[in-house]
Amino acid sequence: MPVPDSVRLAMPVEAVDIARLQRKAWSRQPGTAAALAAIPADQAVRTWHEAIVKPPLAHCRVLVALSQGQVAGFVVTGPSNDPDAEATDGMVAEFVTDADVLDDHASRLVNAAADTLRADGYETATWWVRSDDDALRGFLIECGWAADGAHRSLGTEDGTEAVKQVRLMTRIADRGPAPNAG
């Protein structure tokens, strides 16, 4: 019987698939070669396993998108660690989909991330996006996210590789019931 496509919390055994997808995504992105080379595949699997079974904070979650029963993407949510963050700000810390299924599973993952952050009590969600990732930024804008003016540059200590990012945000708080018009 076919398994319906869905998004759910990651299972420990899926750490291998998550690490594989992350490494595949990082290998396609300029500026991440040093990070990819510095982390052996088995260490990445152990790190993801730990994040699933013993997250660093109670509100840190790893969600997976399933396609025909296989992991096709993942998203990590948690409290925002930005210096200007409020206690009610959550964030999408990592978002990866298999390049072949972006359209199919990206919206499921984005919606599940927002739902998870909302359920954890956050009112606003933030997301750092590579400044040159027009496809992801455009997709998120279509989903209701907007740039908030913040930007940063991440890179290696020797300065040989740098990734410029812009921050997007969206309001996720429940707006409550509509006022009674009668």
Q: Residues of each region from the PLM?
A:
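Conserved beta-strand-loop-alpha-helix junction that forms the acyl-donor binding cleft
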Residues: 97, 127-137
